[in-house]
Amino acid sequence: MELLGQKVKEDGVVIDEKILKVDGFLNHQIDAKLMNEVGRTFYEQFKDKGITKILTIEASGIAPAIMAALHFDVPCLFAKKAKPSTLTDGYYETSIHSFTKNKTSTVIVSKEFLSEEDTVLIIDDFLANGDASLGLYDIAQQANAKTAGIGIVVEKSFQNGHQRLEEAGLTVSSLCKVASLEGNKVTLVGEE
């Protein structure tokens, strides 16, 4: 997705050779028009897969996931990082390690909203080592739901997340693939 690639190159801030900050349009302030295009693109790629639900994790995955859900005309379900007192009827849970935050969290999804009748498209903002996507896939498996694929907004292709997801048998669609953050510069796949 060319527009997204331009935005990553122009507005992304390289923190170090493994961390890219995109707070200006994705992780803090959200460019709604760009996220609409992201959602539309995921719809075009997965529209024939019988998607019944978009699954993501709070918080940064919600914006692209909700836009995808609008295009699919299905609900968006996000895994919570804390169990609310209102969740009393059972839930699926898994542990997910955040590469950026270097923190492991237990995330949960209510059994009320995910079942074997669902075909989910997992959406996430970033793909580094693949832990978040694999954790969401684990939750879908616990529910006996089918996973149609994984939609990633920005993939750090120099890390092993894509490979890990494919080794798990998952279809991965990354809209922007970053080849390198070396030299304090964003280099996209195909520009090396």
From Swiss-Prot:
Recorded metabolic or biological pathway in which this protein acts: Purine metabolism; XMP biosynthesis via salvage pathway; XMP from xanthine: step 1/1
Molecular function per GO: xanthine phosphoribosyltransferase activity
GO BP annotation list: purine ribonucleoside salvage; xanthine metabolic process; XMP salvage
Entry GO terms, CC: cytoplasm
EC number of this enzyme: 2.4.2.22
Keyword Glycosyltransferase among UniProt keywords: yes
Major subcellular site: cytoplasm
CDD domains named among the record's database cross-references: PRTases_typeI (cd06223)
Positions of xanthine binding: L20, N27, K156
Positions with a binding annotation for 5-phospho-alpha-D-ribose 1-diphosphate: A128, N129, G130, D131, A132
Catalytic activity: XMP + diphosphate = xanthine + 5-phospho-alpha-D-ribose 1-diphosphate
Entry keyword annotation includes Glycosyltransferase: yes
Protein keywords: Cytoplasm, Glycosyltransferase, Purine salvage, Transferase
Cellular localisation: Cytoplasm
InterPro entries associated with the record: PRibTrfase_dom, PRTase-like, Pur/Pyrimidine_PRTase, Xanthine_PRibTrfase
Domain of life of the native organism: Bacteria
Coiled coil: none
Function: Converts the preformed base xanthine, a product of nucleic acid breakdown, to xanthosine 5'-monophosphate (XMP), so it can be reused for RNA or DNA synthesis.
Family recorded in the similarity comment: Belongs to the purine/pyrimidine phosphoribosyltransferase family. Xpt subfamily.
Oligomeric and partner information: Homodimer.
Protein name: Xanthine phosphoribosyltransferase
Species of provenance: Staphylococcus aureus (strain NCTC 8325 / PS 47)
